[in-house]
């Protein structure tokens, strides 16, 4: 869908209207929302706590629904991804028997084909399109309060403050905006350990070809088996294979910072909480019963590597994605496991719905009509209502997909089990991919018009 006649914001100059949006967090969701607002001529400032833009993690891929949302937000977002992505041979993500003989179980073909890229490469492309004056780095949010006029006042750890009409938390699984909305106590919504961990690394294509043959370097493959699975995705642009080794873990996540330091100190090294030092031997230990292909792939990982805890918000979800002048998008709203490949794409859908609602409110403000606390609050509630059911479904579904990938019976041990597993995964995949985000936007805008824009 095309944005609603807001193409005059592409030059990056501040729009001549009173609505100001604070985007807290400059990851993929925050940058995509920023470009969507820029295209729709809505004022915004990104407040990023780091000294530069970056993304945790290595590889990423976007499903067809996400690509449609990216194009509708701003075609440059989708193009930024396409420009740095590698297309898998045949356009398929193939799933094979990782326990026995590499037999093909099923394939998923997504839209124009499966492709993947490095997160940092996409971020680097997106940042090129955002004017520097719209960005504030080293801004670590401390609190959000209201001033006497009802506007939001953001206070940062360096003592500086900023005012905004809308605050959007795109600040990830440990969202400070979410804490400002719902608190940070034991009963507050938060990301929790999903009892899944991952070992991740990049392996030179030449090593993969020498060990397993050149045919393994051009295909995206998932090796499935009891208790774990391995994904190998080619990144041809850098001649590397991205390996992700996932292990289901019934134990609590033990990290060396939780409960041992004040919150401020814990926050200042998030990576220590979610990524612990580990070894290739630990990863190999979890896959001793898998076939030689899987064991050989894992043997190509570096001797020392990180062990990533996978967190999601299934067990402690946010009751809403909006409260007053604040709202959440992406992982801050609905962090999910990576098993269905839909988490980042859900952030793109969030950004599109939110950008269209904020553009409609900004147009109202430019016309001289009132856009105060009530109008903004109602608009953000409509955004939350538009996104909540689908995003929470994804969190649950992604957990379920991991259960299917790591079924206790090995693949090839009975056709009765294999068919429903592949069928359910395909059904869940199409529920993710076939979503009509344009219709969701139109429905949300219709509610906004009926409740806010045409009432006053």
UniProtKB/Swiss-Prot annotation:
InterPro entries: FAD-bd, FAD/NAD-bd_sf, FAD_monoxygenase
One GO cellular component term noted in the UniProt record for this chain: membrane
Sequence intervals crossing the membrane: 18-38
Swiss-Prot/TrEMBL cofactor(s): FAD
Topology of this chain in the membrane: Single-pass membrane protein
One Pfam family per UniProt: FAD_binding_3
Glycosylation sites noted in the Swiss-Prot or TrEMBL record: 43
Residues engaged in binding FAD: 48, 119, 331, 344
Enzyme class: oxidoreductase
Family named by the database record: Belongs to the paxM FAD-dependent monooxygenase family.
Molecular function in Gene Ontology: FAD binding; monooxygenase activity
Compartments in which it is found: Membrane
Species, as recorded: Hypocrea jecorina (strain QM6a)
Signal peptide bounds: none
Protein name (database record): FAD-dependent monooxygenase sor5
Signals that turn on the gene: The promoter contains putative CRE1 binding motifs 5'-SYGGRG-3' and expression is differentially regulated in light and darkness by CRE1. Photoreceptors BLR1 and BLR2 negatively regulate the expression, while ENV1 exerts positive regulation. Moreover the SOR biosynthetic genes show a mechanism of positive feedback on each other in darkness.
UniProt keyword Membrane, yes or no: yes
Active site location: 200
Phenotype of null mutants: Leads to the production of only traces of sorbicillinol, probably resulting of chemical conversions and not of enzymatic activity. Abolishes production of trichodimerol and dihydrotrichotetronin in darkness. Also impacts production of paracelsin in a light dependent manner, with decreased paracelsin levels in light, but likely in an indirect way.
EC number: 1.-.-.-
GO biological process, one term: secondary metabolite biosynthetic process
Involved pathway(s): Secondary metabolite biosynthesis
